[in-house]
Amino acid sequence: MKIERMYARGAEYQRFETLKRNREKRTRQKLAFMEGVQMVEQAIRHNWEFAAMAVADGRRLSGWAEDMIAKAKPEILYQMEEGMHADLSDREESCEIVALVRERTDGLERIEEKASESSMPPLYAVFDRPASPGNLGTFLRSADAFGGTGVIVTGHAADFYDPQCIRASVGTVFAIPFTEMPSAEGALEWLHARPEKPLIVGTSAHGTKNLDEIDLTGPVALAIGNETFGLSRAWKDGCDVLAKIPIFGAASSLNAGSAATVCFYEISRQRLAKGLK
């Protein structure tokens, strides 16, 4: 591991800043900016590669930070001027470590691999055209919490590696397999070809059945739609059933991330009630 001091806002510092805010640069360089205890721990636990880590020069590192650096083995460790380090953080009190992690593409293969390894019926979590990185992060977090096999986004979507997504996911973006597909048609074709033949459940305020009226104990693909427009016509036509969540307040629907969490919980509840673990 190479160690360098950084006291000027030159090219290397600007790289941290740019990767934090610019999706195109993240995609081109295959690098993502991250900070936060849980995010760092999850990335290390799941064997992601660190291109760089940065700590504040002159600040005594905690045992946790020293342990994380030793486990991560970043290609380079920057000892950064304290004010510069603080400026990279969106937190009131900056995390000891900010980092650049190498992006990786899981593809459908890793989702298929996880499905074949699990004793539970697969749960494929689909988010159609998510616009908000925060909602995408919440979706990842909830899918992981309630036994999701993998996450698939379709169409033009928010960036998995946006710092807001990473933060909202509490690092589960590094734990659960995920992939992007350009169209609903491609995702539906893949789901229909799966040997376990999952029930494809879409969500809609105008669904034909309440969520809890559907048997969700077998293989399931759950599709959540865009925050404003809901599921695309292709998804609505391709689903086996459209489910609705009964709500009784003034709002006609839930936030996409909240709706997904309710759905994932109901799937988990039914499976636990049937003794599936």
Write out the residue ranges for each language-model feature.
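Structured adenosyl-cofactor binding patch, chiefly the S-adenosyl-L-methionine
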Residues: A99, S142-F146, F160, Q164-V173, ...
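RNA substrate-binding interface of SAM-dependent RNA methyltransferases
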Residues: R45, L100, T105-G207
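Boundary-proximal intrinsically disordered activation/regulatory segments immediately upstream
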Residues: M1-W64, A157-D159
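Amphipathic alpha-helical repeat scaffolds
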Residues: G36, A131-T138, L254-S258
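Short acidic-hydrophobic, aromatic-tinged amphipathic segments that line or gate anion-handling sites
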Residues: E4-Y7, I76-E81, P177-G186
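Active-site/ligand-binding-proximal alpha/beta "capping" segment
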Residues: V201-A251
